[in-house]
Amino acid sequence: MGDSITIIGAGPAGLCCALWLVEAGHRVTVLEKQTGLPEDMRASTFHPATLDLLDGSGVTKTLLGQGTRVRRWQYLRHGHDERIVFDLAAIADSTGHPYRLQVEQFRLTSAIVQRLRDHPGFRLLRGARLAGLEGGRDTVRYRYEQHGESIEDQAQWLIAADGGRSTVRKILGLSFEGSVFPRTSITLVLDHRFQDDAPGLLGVNYVWTDDGHYSLMRVRDLWRFSFSPEDEENPVEAQDAKAAQARLQAVFPRDRPYRIAQLNHYTLHQRCLERFRLGRILFCGDSAHLNSPAGGMGMNSGIHDAACLVEHLLPVLAGKAGEGHLDRYDRRRRTIALDEVQRLSARNYRRHRETDPERRSVIWADLAATAADRERHRDFLLDSSMLRSRQREREID
């Protein structure tokens, strides 16, 4: 086995790093502060570019058996017979997976853990909370707490994939500049046949109401209903179950309450580290950058970070490149985070939450013209599927 790498965080980005490093013959230890893998639906969209990346390890095949393939998705105006449909067949020549896969992110992390659990090069420490960290010239020393004990260890390289509230980032005192979007996002998971209430629904739907918005996405027999508080709503009160029922009844009225399986709310940030590499400490995923979830790019971009990080780390581990080779990982993925992921997700955030009638008319006309024009349709989907960001990443030296 090769050099040892420690990864902080067992989310999608961290475990994808672990998967690809172990497959390449390296020893990996993953520290996860929680005792189990979370099973919420914070992210549920796998874009074509991500499915292509996961194909080689067999993970995509596993996920396909657990999710819903969405080949066509749409914008709708609730209560009006108006829709704009985008068809991923337009980019079938650029991907092996011309569809979005709607499946919970924990299906990915569970699949990777199952794949690696008996591998001698993989060690997952649950309930292990990072408590100290010191980067050196040849190693990274760290301390973690588990089962009431304080344990010291070291690795040749440490990957911080521990999320938006990264402990690694805080221990190192790194600035995480950016801003908070003005509206929270509230997500409900329901076991209800919305397709019977609105027969024109597709697997992914972005919907304007007269004075607000919601999105509705299908994951097998479940639906994920997301919205933001209205302007006049108290944002805290909007997050309780009573307010959620009121929002559901406003768009899909019925004579009894909905059964809500999950209710989650998220504060939305747009932030980015100044550098994704600090010596032998590397950052990826939400620990490195945050963006609006509009368009489903957050988890996907974290997985893309992981692929790019491993691609640059492997030749360094093999002695075929110097440590400076990893600076290109920083340049590539930081540029993509700022110029592609944050730009597109912020545009989606504004588009979905626009309420001014005149500005809505302009947006709607532009989307309709885009969908109707073959080249613009394809161009739009290359961006939204994240295939273009992967292409642009490879053009950055």
Give the role of each language-model region:
Residues 1, 228, 274, 312-397:
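C-terminal helical "tail/cap" subdomain of flavin- and related membrane-associated enzymes
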Residues 1-5, 23-24:
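Extreme N-terminal leader/targeting segments of oxidoreductases
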Residues 5-7, 28, 281:
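Conserved hydrophobic helix-helix packing surfaces used for dimerization/oligomerization
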Residues 9-19, 23, 112, 160, ...:
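Conserved mid-domain beta->alpha element of the FAD-binding
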Residues 22-42:
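Glycine-rich FAD pyrophosphate-binding loop
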Residues 42, 47-115, 341:
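Active-site-adjacent segment of FAD-dependent monooxygenases/related oxidoreductases
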Residues 114, 140, 149, 157, ...:
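Conserved FAD-binding catalytic core of PHBH/FMO-like flavoproteins
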Residues 126-140:
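A conserved short coil-to-beta-strand element within the FAD-binding core of flavoproteins
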